[in-house]
Amino acid sequence: MPSYVIHLSCAKRALEMLPEMNAQEQNAFFLGNMIADMCRDKHYTHFWNNVTYDKLVRRPDLDWFLQKYGDALQEPYVRGYYAHLLLDYNFLDLYWDRHFRFYNAQKQPEVLYDAVTFVEVLELQQMYDRQEFFSKKWYYGDYDRMNAYFANRYNVMFPNLEFNAKEWERIRRITEIDWDYAPEAMERTKAQLSQSVAIAEPGIIPQLQIFVLPELEQLVEVTAKKVAEI
């Protein structure tokens, strides 16, 4: 899935396309956009249904989310949450499907989460061991390498938890979030982002190992436009 910074970048672009929101509404929109990742177990926060859960490519069930919360989709927090799920869905359909293929131990095509052993990056014509691929050296290392770039390029806003009682009532209507854990996770994530931005050289294009930066930027634009059109 995209990093939280890419999610916040997409949220920022969507916000620029939406009717103007006040500061509190913007904060709720950004919170909704990242809160699904601020949990230990993402099964239900990401609306992975039983069909997709046993697969490596776990697409959010957007219809499931809309059935539960579609009546509140115009609320900033709920729209921000939907934007997160939509970017995850598009990331798998428009990026992963174009660039990656997955194989089992016999190097036959594989879809099951527990059976995928190798990952092929098509444009590199390179096969990776799955554990090595999803590591700080390659896949997740690219996230670290580009977090500051996206944060600076899109001037992302990191949300806070300063809401009044009525606003909290709206936020807690999405019941999948573990609020005993999420605030601590947000603080850790905020500190990591601040550190990444502090040591980054402004304007430097990150040298990525796996990802194609212009395609990720295009994905942000395409998804933000769809969010704004809801």
What positions do the PLM features span?
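N-terminal leader/auxiliary helical segments
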Residues: 1-230
